Amino acid sequence: MRRPPPLGPTTASGPEGNVRNLRKRQAPGPGAAGGCGPEAGGRGENRQKRRMVARATPGRGEVKSDKSVAASGAGKAARRRVEGRRGQVSPSDRRGLEAAKEAEFPLQTERHTKEKRKVTEASTDDPQPGFDLVRKESLTSSESFQTVECLRSLGKEGIVEGIKRRIRNKKLKSLENPPLKITENEATQNIKVEFQDELYKNTLKYSCNILSPEVENNFVFKLRDCNCFPHSKDCNDENNLPYEPDGGCMHVAENFSKKENFRSLAEKSDTNNIPQLLQTEENVMGVNKLLPEESDLYQSKINGLLPCLQREKNKYSIEESSVGRKPRKRMKLSEKADETVTQMNFSNEYNKSELMLQENQMIADGKEAEAKSPLNVLRKVSHNTVSLMDHLLSVPEMVEKETSSEHHVNAVFQKTIEPLLKEETENASEPLGYENMALKEDFKSKSCIGKSPEYHIERRSSREDLRSDSEELKLSCQRTIPMTGKRTWPYYSCARISAWCWKKASLPESSYFLPGSQKSCKKVDVPKHQTNKTHLTDSKLLLQSSLTETNTESSSKEKLDSNLNCLFSVSAVEHTLMVIKEPIIKDDKKIKSEELSRSGSEVISNTTEDTQLTSDTQSLTGNKKRDRGNLTKLNLTAASKDGQEANNSTGKTIHRKACVAKQTFVVPDLVKILNTGRLTNFKIPLLKNKTKKRKEVNAKSSEREAYSPLELLDNLSGADTRQNRSKENVSMTMLGPQTLSIQNSVTPVQASSDSFYNKNSCSISPSFTKHGNSSKPSNHFSEPGNIVSNKEVASLTVENNAFSSDPGYVEKSPSFCCNKQETFRPVSSEVRGRKITKNFSEVGFPDILKAYEDDVLLIDVIQDDPDLFGVSNEGELSFTSEVPRISQEPNVPGEHQLTDSKYVETPVKKEPSDDLRELPVLDCGPIKPDICASNSAASEIRHDPKDANTSLGEVANETSENETLGDFSEQIKGSDLDEKHRFTDKVITKEEKENIYEVRKSKDSRNADIMVGECQFAAPVPKPLCLLVPPLNLSGHQEDTILNTWMNDFRFLGKHSVLKLQNPETCEIFKREKNVGVFQKSLGLMIPYKYCKFHFNTLRGCERPLCKFAHVPEQGDEKVCMDVFKKYININELCLLQRAVNVFMEYYRKFPPGIYFDLQVLNDLLNSLLKHCLLKEVFQIVNLSIMVKMLPSLKILLNIFEHVATMKLRNAVPALIDIFCKLVEAGMVLDPEHFNYIVKLLYQVQASKQEITAVLEMKSRLQMRQFKKNWKCDLDSALNKLEHCKEKGDWTKLGKLYINVKMGCEKFADFQTFCACIAETLTKNCEDERPDTPFCEFAETVSKDPQNSKVDKGVLGRIGISAMYFYHKLLQWSKGRKVLDKLYELKIHFASLKGLIGPEKLASRCQIVNVAAEIFLKSGSLDGALWVMRESEWIIDTPLWPCDRLDVLNRHNLLCTIAHETLAKSLYRQTFEVLQNLPGFQNSQETVEVSQYSLLFNKLLGSCIESNSLGMSSSVAEFMISKSIPIDFSFLRRLITSLGRSRLWLKARAHYKSALSLGCYPPLEGNLYRKLLLIPSYLSEIEMLLAIEIFMVSNASSIQSPGTSTQILQIVLKRCEDNQSRSNDDYQAAVERLIMAARISDPKLFVKHMTVNVNKEQVYSLEHCSALKWLKENMKWAGKVWLFSNH
């Protein structure tokens, strides 16, 4: 159970009490440490501490010497006992260790004093007064903590309590300026003091904890086989630490508790934490010196201590889970902010403050942890385990709690880490005094962390706790108005900036998790971490202003945390989220809600876990910018935990001064870490309803909870502290394996930068990573250029953070990457770093603090204000792009595996018009679970998708996230080096030499463009810098990580840009853009409605995935094309020119050039493309123009050659030569000098001999063509050649002569004359008996010409007609037939042509066809004659082709001849076709009498009937009847009978009816209605049946009426007059046919014989029933057939 805090003013709750206590603490005096004996040392002690630090930094030897000096007497003996024995430490041993502790404590005190002085000096440099106060406070608190720890080591609990009170008072005094923070800090300090007391008791119980609190702080021990020991706040818990076989490997004896306590403290009060952190840093520095010796002692006892520690840890975790939720809630916002501030400050004062902060924070955390529930403490513990820095911070408290066990563990870690720490300390000490201490701690943390990769199990539990806490936060966390007492802004107020800082401690306690636990916790805490990250970012914003003061302390603490986190921040993404949530554990619900709200506003999601960490770090360094709210935009905090951890550690080194100076703190490792994290596109949320949205955000959305920069200014004291805490938490989370590596990697970027930068900058040597838990850190950031530079980096830069991550740093510290940074995606960070760096370089944010000092009026506007920025969906562009979602939700290990030891490169495609503000930030995305933390981070991301999905705010207009996303996977595969070089080249080569980023004002003064040096970031100016981060080197585990690209818009108040998304929300964003006015102005084109106005009439073009309007002009709209081309050419924008190319290609591939085609437009377009070096597009257009026979000018061709030669585009030469040859072949004429110039250019490009030879061949060919042209144009010479060919009968040569003349003759008249001469030549002298035909040989030669065209066919056809007439005249049918066959072979349709000479030149078409048909007939080719007729379409005389009567007569005779021949061959169809086309049938105007054709048709009809061709017979009969051609009735009756017998009743009835109309049968009208039918006996049975049908239908009414059944229907078989000569047999046969007719009817009819009339004619009666039945079945069709006429 935790001890109740001592009563007194120091413990007074509420802001007043805290303020009073802070004021007391701030009271000046030599006993700034609170009057504690050891701490009361004057400057002499500080000097001694400095000297000791200097000794510790040079190397292990010095450290060991310091340790030996420090450890004297019983202390040494105790250590020996401990080292000699690894079993359970006995009480005596513990006492010995404590004695050693006491011996070492003075050294620690001195160290603290030195660090205090350093801090004080640094603060004096700061332009803002708040810094000095904070630093003093931190020193005081650190001294008091040291005193308390000394007393604890002595076992004087009572004295410790008194000291605690003093410390509280001092802290309260020091924190007087920020009343709210002071109150929170005071409470936190009280808790810390109490917790320290308890820890001290525990320490007494566990005497094995010999190391001083400082030493313990520095120790983080990770055992793969051991579980992480969460240290409960209560001493009893620590004593009863149970062993947890969770597999948590990290055993941080006191680091865990300290972390927990520190976080709790940070959550409660940033200010208190800061002083404590400073003290802790000092203590830690002292501890670093003592570590080597103590580590030896601890190593001997590790085995025994681990089980104890594990038990205690388990126990503490259990107790923490059950204890102190309410206190934690009380401290939610303030503590979180404090932790963030502390972390930032910690990173600023990384070395000095780090130690002091560690002790202070650990003490404060211990207290806070006591106040908080054990669960929170446990979470913190796990987080502490995660981040070595956090462990170090938590060591003091841990010392008290898990005194002996944790000390042993710490000792072991220290031993392991000592060498690393020494190296790191040396590296750090060189650049910065603070760095030495911080590096030591980092190394210690690293080694410890590296030892316990299995810790993730416990982290998982802690994450779960964090989740629960975050859930609580979600429920309870609302955007609270700062407690500073200064002006507050309502949620809807325009004064509240979009980048609202999280008032609650945004840092999750997850940062306290051990790496192993972090992994497990990541899954659970991802949402929280994300939220916390967002909080961190916001808090950083708030903190940045106040952090400038508190930043030193908090940054020191953060440094430790971040260093530790760096180790774990390999899984930094998850860690970061965890960190954010750690402070939330206290106010878990609030924090979670805050996280959610923040992540909403900042668009920080699970993906942004790392970004949040980065943002925290950045906010630490760039608190001012963060305060602006831009920090919130950055969201880089979560982007890369690892980077942030590194950054945090660095940032911790960074002092307030640096923050105040706004100098960008260059932390390459931090940048890497930032890159590792998934940076959601941090965009200022646009809220439809400011009030509503703000409330939602504040109350429960937990997606975004931001504080206005104004509030930040007001709340700097309080909110900054919270932010520092949250940042510290973040850094703790980042403290994973990455933290250590980060510190090593980090090197001072720019000493020239403000002191803030120098302080903040921490050099991290590659060895640091190596010394870290494993080589994994190096794997992650093994590449020096690897920096978490994506959104995270951007966030840092934007924040004005001293963290202008320097690629150089990262490069310097390839080992920066923690082993577990596998989770962290350096590749993505690299990629992001580059692109983000570019974007960030363009982004600039006003510094609130600086503006305040300069008396500048800063107007804070909520970017979600619809009045100002339009209404966006859900108050902001929900950045739910596929990539962010992937990074958040699908943070599956598999995704992380995409990048195999390759640098993930996420290019952010930015159009030239992108404002510098518009910064696309790449989200590192979830890191592969290879790092336990990364795995959990992925789960966490998945768990808290809405944070990731929360709107990014505004995205750069020009930035195309889709592109970024599309290329993301490939870039991940890409190498960091490539991207790094690419990025560096793009940014500025000058900066490569300088190795710094130069800040240049962008279009918007708020935007700063940072130049990338050789992987280094420099912050030369206090202006807000955008971190350009070179691509991170994704090594080892990072290979598996996948980066998710995010677009981050860090614009402060600029125009809103729209991020192109590849998801269904694109349309909504499109609408938003439209509302906001993001679209560019119309280009002024008059585009028809059916075409997309965005595609044609805007610079950006159409962004709709499915546009209902056309993007390519349709046929007939060539004028639109030309107008578009002209406009685009005038504007001369690259994107428009490319669009013009697409339109040109799409249109002219489908449609040929029309009347609106302008060759000058084509030439201008090609020139514009050449100017923009779009050679590929030029080739495409030229090739297409050749196809459509629209050749560009010769000047364009020469310009293309010049461009290729100038640009040395050797690869383009083959394609260019091909185009050149095509142009020459198409008719382009070049002079010899042009050829010589082209050859010269080709030599410059070093073209091959073959290519140059091809050009020379074209030259010779063109010259020959010109020579032939001159010769061909000589008509006289051509005619002479013609005569020569005629004389020799060389018709083949004549054909070649024709081809040459055709190619060279310019005048068509001359060509016609020449062709007429050829026709005459071919027809003369052909009277001989030679079988050959000159025309055929000539036509064969001409037809073989490859350039043979329709003109040639026309000429050959006309010459052939002349030859045909010639042979027809001579009756040489065979030769004429050959001519016609050749024309048929060549598919020359001569029927539509006329001859060239003679009468055929004026012949009608009918005549030409007649001649040809006659030739075929005379030659015996009936098919040829029919072919000629069909080809001529049987045309005789038409208005278009008139002819004379002789031609018609000739045609009639010809067709009759053909008909007789075909009919003789039984070709009935061909005969009928010929007869149908006889003159008189085609044209009604023809005066030919068609009745004359009766014989022909009847002959054909008879032939068809005889051959039983019923179909043809029926067609002929119908045609004859229709044309009124007399028909033979006998043929017609035969046809009807044949059709009936063939059951073709329809045609039989039709023809019978026609026959009746023609008079073929006697009329029936008179007899039908008398119920009497007269049937001639000569009719066939078919004809009789048809007559009966007509009879029944005519009398149907009488037959069907009732009562008429008695009526009789009589049928008389009439004898014909002319049949009298016929015998009775014929009549009897007629009777039988009648009976048969009745039978074949369907249904059958019954005819009954009645009598014989006077004429001896048989009379029959038709039975009524049968007739009635037939009518019922057939009346429907019978009525139509017989009662109605067909015409």
Swiss-Prot record:
Gly residues: compositionally biased ranges: 31-41
Residue spans of biased composition, Polar residues class: 598-622, 948-963
InterPro entries registered for this protein in UniProt: TOPAZ1, TOPAZ1_dom
Residue spans of biased composition, Basic and acidic residues class: 80-113
Keyword Ribosomal protein belongs to the record: no
Keywords, comma-separated and alphabetical: Cytoplasm, Differentiation, Spermatogenesis
Record-level GO BP terms: cell differentiation; spermatocyte division
Compartments where found: Cytoplasm, Cytosol
Keyword hit for Cytoplasm: yes
Disordered, as annotated region: 1-132, 596-632, 938-969
Main localization category: cytoplasm
GO cellular component terms given for this protein: cytosol
Origin: domain of life: Eukaryota
Pfam families reported for this sequence: Asp_Glu_race_2
Role this protein plays: Important for normal spermatogenesis and male fertility. Specifically required for progression to the post-meiotic stages of spermatocyte development. Seems to be necessary for normal expression levels of a number of testis-expressed gene transcripts, although its role in this process is unclear.
Protein name: Protein TOPAZ1
Species this chain originates from: Macaca mulatta
